[in-house]
Amino acid sequence: MQKRHPIIYLLITLLIFVPVSYGALDLELTKGVTAAIPIAIMPFAGPSVLAPGDETIPQVIKNDLQNSGQFRVTGSGNLDQTAASLEQIDYSYWRKQKVNALVVGAINPLGMRRYRVAFTLINVFDSNNRLLSESFNVNAKELRNLAHHISDLIYQKLTGVRGVFSTKIAYVLVQASSENTAAKYTLEVADADGFNPQPLLVSDMPIMSPTWSPDGNKIAYVSFEGHRAAIYLQDLATGRRQRLSEAPGINGAPAFSPDGKQLALVLTKTGNPKIYILNLADGHLREITKGWSIDTEPAWSPDGKSLLFTSNRDGTPQIYNYSFADGSINRVTYRGDYNARPSFMPDGKSIIMMHRENGLFGIARQDLSTGQVQILSESGTDESPSLAPNGKMAIYAMEYGGRGVLAQVSIDGQIKLRLPARNGNVQEPAWSPYLGV
């Protein structure tokens, strides 16, 4: 039999748009969102131009805001109040609909598939209070990205928190093998709503643990090409790769420090898996956990002064905190017989984690001062949570319909939704930091 070699394709740029058709997000409201801001998104004046994905700009904005859990967006039945100008808006109608804010806009063709898009955010209870008004010139391929940007602006104006609709997600897609072919592993990067997935790396050997650099320009991950584990760093703009670690045994669970100068990783240089810190400038490596236990899944605190990790040092997988100041290690989790995959909330006051209780795996949040645990999801198969950069949503993998899919949950547990994905099993999603300015 001819020996099969790993197939590795480096896809240099993520900027080339590949049109792929997906259905709408599958939104599952788990309980009433009583504090949601009521808002209406009106059809934009001008030609009904479809953004990539066959949705209009108002439709993309509506989905973004609604799926955030922070807004109650009026249904399409109320969107017949289109106004040719701001002066024609029937404010009394929208007040009767108990809408607080209104988004109106217009699209004007500029020729050569370019458009001028303008929008205004209005306080319905004060016709003179235009909360936000912006205009942009973009080409047709940029319309969906612009819609996400408008959603970000609206979200921040009304909540005081920066939106994440223009961020990205990375994940591993595993497509099952047939009789004559090996399973295919693809590292993909997509928009935060799951649209526009772009392959970064394709291999017939496993890919694991993608993690974003703090500037959002690179992704580190584990690849088993050559039948051995190694950690790689890949530039998203150029596709250029750098091998960071290929020590004998395990090379796993990379995690960038907040300043991007160091990488926490897991190696088996001394036997059992231990946490190491790699200086990315000079390659200096130091071990920070020791002993017989299995220590893995490091996650930095926002200030870089401590590190969460998963360990079985007390018998079952639990989460511990390592202090860089004195090297002390303290147990963090006690509820449940399995707690893993931790990460800090942006304020450093609580964490999210994979949690098992009564035999069911779910996503949970724990307050670090009180130890109180809130269950966010508990389908029984939820795993690998990753926080949005504003700390308001988490993305994770779950089993649905017999395969692994992407899902999101709001940090209060009120909103759950499934994202579109290609055929296959989705594993280990990672939410990007804020991108650009």
From Swiss-Prot:
Secretion signal, residue range per the UniProt entry: 1-23
Cellular component, GO, one term: periplasmic space
Single GO BP term: protein import
Name the record gives this protein: Tol-Pal system protein TolB
Gene (name only): tolB
Source species: Coxiella burnetii (strain RSA 493 / Nine Mile phase I)
Superkingdom of the source species: Bacteria
Gene3D superfamilies per the UniProt record, alphabetical: TolB, C-terminal domain, TolB, N-terminal domain
The protein's role, per its UniProt record: Part of the Tol-Pal system, which plays a role in outer membrane invagination during cell division and is important for maintaining outer membrane integrity.
Family, similarity comment: Belongs to the TolB family.
InterPro entries for the chain: 6-blade_b-propeller_TolB-like, PD40, Tol-Pal_TolB, TolB_N
